[in-house]
Amino acid sequence: MRVKHAVVLLMLISPLSWAGTMTFQFRNPNFGGNPNNGAFLLNSAQAQNSYKDPSYNDDFGIETPSALDNFTQAIQSQILGGLLSNINTGKPGRMVTNDYIVDIANRDGQLQLNVTDRKTGQTSTIQVSGLQNNSTDF
């Protein structure tokens, strides 16, 4: 009876022990694997990399202006726009900021802007023709 059980047991287990051919495939494309795996492997390696280069500067030297700087710039733009819109009526204007002094006048149909840099003292004059003929001095 023991022999019968042993034979039956061997017959039941033997199909489970049949081995197939083992094949090995490289995963890494550097060693002959599928090149489509390259992006996946690179992303996996970068996700595991916790090293941060201390000399790496992420902002590319760009300084982000503060909310107060943005507000100041917006107010200056609005005032300068108001001065430019009043020039057609013959009203001259002047805007003084920390950096510049801007004088605006309508001289015989020409828009004249005198921009003075307060730090260096340099003056630039911009003249644009084609305005109405209302002459007004500073």
UniProtKB/Swiss-Prot annotation:
One of its GO terms (biological process) is curli assembly. Pfam families: CsgF (PF10614). GO terms for cellular component: cell outer membrane; curli secretion complex. Residues 1-19 form the signal peptide. The keyword Signal applies. Keywords: Cell outer membrane, Membrane, Signal. It is found in: Cell outer membrane. One of its GO terms (molecular function) is identical protein binding. InterPro entries: T8SS_CsgF (IPR018893). May be involved in the biogenesis of curli organelles. This is Curli production assembly/transport component CsgF. It comes from Escherichia coli (strain K12). The gene is csgF.
